[in-house]
């Protein structure tokens, strides 16, 4: 219940971003470590190869970690047992692109347009708030997020974040 209330509050009253220079290689490695025990217990491989040419970006590291954790935990649930979650990061124009790909059950084509809508869920136990919060945080950072999925094959969530943020948060 506390998680639901916290997520709901983040949707209606976004928090102020605590911006700082962020090394994405370090942040991604750290966020993967946070879910590694859960993934290992389900025999899910976590794959990430650091990209030495990746620029630092201006971001809120806690909020960005929250985004990645939500994507990883959704991927772990979608896979269930025995699968792979791959994370890639690369330069893309004046920003960076981060992709999280899983070998899970995928998302039905008719559900893709609603995936970031508050209260929409594909899971019996889900609140439908997690991806809405993810979308909100990415937008606060001046970025975008997209999903590509094929039922039975898995999903890829792709974030694009600018190197230098144009503030979009309420206190900005």
Predicted regions located by residue number:
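Short beta-strand/loop element within the Bergerat-fold HATPase_c
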Residues: 82-94
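Detector for a conserved hydrophobic position within an alpha-helical segment of the HATPase_c
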Residues: 137-139
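A conserved beta-strand-to-alpha-helix junction within the catalytic ATP-binding
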Residues: 18-32
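Conserved micro-motifs of the catalytic ATP-binding
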Residues: 15-17, 56-59, 122
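Short helix N-cap motif at coil->helix boundaries in the Bergerat
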Residues: 24, 106-114
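Conserved catalytic submotifs in the C-terminal HATPase_c
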Residues: 20, 40, 45-55
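Short alpha-helical Gxxx[C/S/T] motif in the catalytic ATP-binding
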Residues: 130, 134
């Amino acid at each position: 219940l506390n998680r639901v209330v916290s997520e709901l509050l983040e949707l209606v009253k976004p928090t102020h971003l605590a911006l700082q220079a962020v090394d994405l290689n370090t942040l991604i490695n750290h966020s993967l470590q946070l879910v590694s025990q859960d993934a290992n217990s389900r025999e899910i491989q976590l794959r990430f190869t650091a990209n030495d040419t990746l620029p630092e970006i201006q971001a809120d590291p806690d909020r960005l970690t929250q985004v990645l954790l939500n994507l990883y935990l959704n991927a772990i649930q979608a896979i269930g047992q025995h699968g792979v979650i791959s994370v890639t990061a690369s330069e893309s124009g004046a920003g960076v692109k981060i992709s999280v790909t899983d070998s899970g059950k995928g998302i039905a084509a008719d559900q893709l347009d609603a995936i970031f809508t508050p209260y929409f869920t594909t899971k019996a136990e889900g609140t439908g708030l997690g991806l809405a919060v993810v979308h909100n945080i990415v937008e606060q950072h001046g970025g975008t997020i997209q999903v590509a999925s094929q039922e039975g094959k898995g999903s890829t969530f792709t974030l694009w974040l600018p190197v230098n943020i144009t503030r979009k948060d309420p206190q900005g």
